[in-house]
């Protein structure tokens, strides 16, 4: 297992904490292979957590699938990915989302984004405390784009 660590999104510009926006790629059973490939291309640090790490799998044969992976490349490229469980829709070619993340200091802003993006769309996962301690929610906006919102839990380090 690769060290499990979740990105807090606490990027700074001149000391100001800001929300980060990253692509989030979806895969069907080969997220680890894909993210390791991208690490070979971009270098940097790759962290991976499985569904089993958080007892979050619905199917017993999915415990070793990637629940969350993050690659921070040598040149600052940051993107994330995961395996899409069998019970969720998956279509190759449209297997990406946008991820908004920030610290608990950004909670009001990120909660506002969640509400505004979901207006006229569909909340797929309400914004609530997740097994890893952060607040997390997922929605599909009125234009069909899936958004993931993650707010670092209290005491999370940047």
Regions found by a protein language model. Name each.
Residues 61-62, 91-94:
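Short glycine/proline-enriched turns and hinge-like loops at secondary-structure junctions
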Residues 2-19, 47, 67-72, 77-82, ...:
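Vicinal oxygen chelate
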């Amino acid at each position: 297992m690769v060290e499990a660590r979740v990105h807090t999104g606490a990027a700074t510009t001149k000391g100001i904490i800001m929300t980060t926006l990253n692509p989030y790629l979806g895969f069907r059973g080969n997220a680890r292979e894909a993210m390791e490939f991208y690490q070979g291309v971009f270098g940097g640090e790759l962290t991976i957590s499985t569904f089993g790490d958080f007892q979050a799998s619905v199917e017993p044969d999915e415990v070793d699938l990637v629940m969350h992976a993050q690659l921070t490349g040598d040149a600052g490229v940051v993107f994330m990915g995961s395996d899409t469980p069998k019970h969720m829709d998956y279509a190759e070619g449209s297997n990406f989302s946008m991820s908004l993340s920030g610290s608990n200091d950004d909670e009001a802003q990120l909660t506002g984004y969640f509400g505004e993006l979901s207006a006229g769309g569909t909340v797929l996962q309400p914004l609530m405390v997740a097994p890893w301690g952060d607040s997390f929610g997922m929605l599909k906006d009125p234009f069909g784009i899936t958004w993931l919102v993650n707010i670092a839990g209290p005491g999370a380090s940047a």
